[in-house]
Amino acid sequence: DKIPVTSTGKVRKELQKITLKDTKWRRKVSACNTIKPSVYNMLVEAFAGGYTHANYIFTDEVFKNVDSFDETSAYPYVLVTRRFPMKDFRECRIKKREDMLPNFAYLIRVKFYNIKCKYYNNFISASKCNNFAGGKLDNGRIIKAKEIDITLTDIDFKFILDTYDCERYEITQSYYAIYEYLPNQFINFVLEKYVNKTKFKGVKG
């Protein structure tokens, strides 16, 4: 075996050996590999990393005696407690937020008209938009726009509706997949690593 470049590489190898023994899980993953190229492209478009951005009201200012907090082990918590799309995405015809059912993940392409952020922290990246017209940006993030066309997951779509005002929106394409928990052996693996991490945290040597 090759020496892993990082510690995470070692953990991935260990998990891979466990999941490869689960034939039921392998069949489920194989079934998802039949995804249409058009849907795959939408999934790539919808992908977004974490939010790291300055509040533009305070950019370039130095503050003293500030405080912060850290949510420890947030990623393992999400992996263990949240559900994920576990089937292939199929076309549907939803038109609004209220059409979305809690047991399904959604992938949509949506147009927003006269959209404006409610807060000084702006969340939509103009670079992720298929179309962006007549707007104002905060270092690449959209403060407001006459029209944008963007591909989103149901989670990001609901987040945008909660953090932006808009005159109206139009869902032009939509797909759904069933939400399910990750396999038990995966969850148990994460929990085992979490226990080990907390048990040996701060131990000398």
Language model features: what each stretch is:
Residues 1-205:
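Conserved acidic
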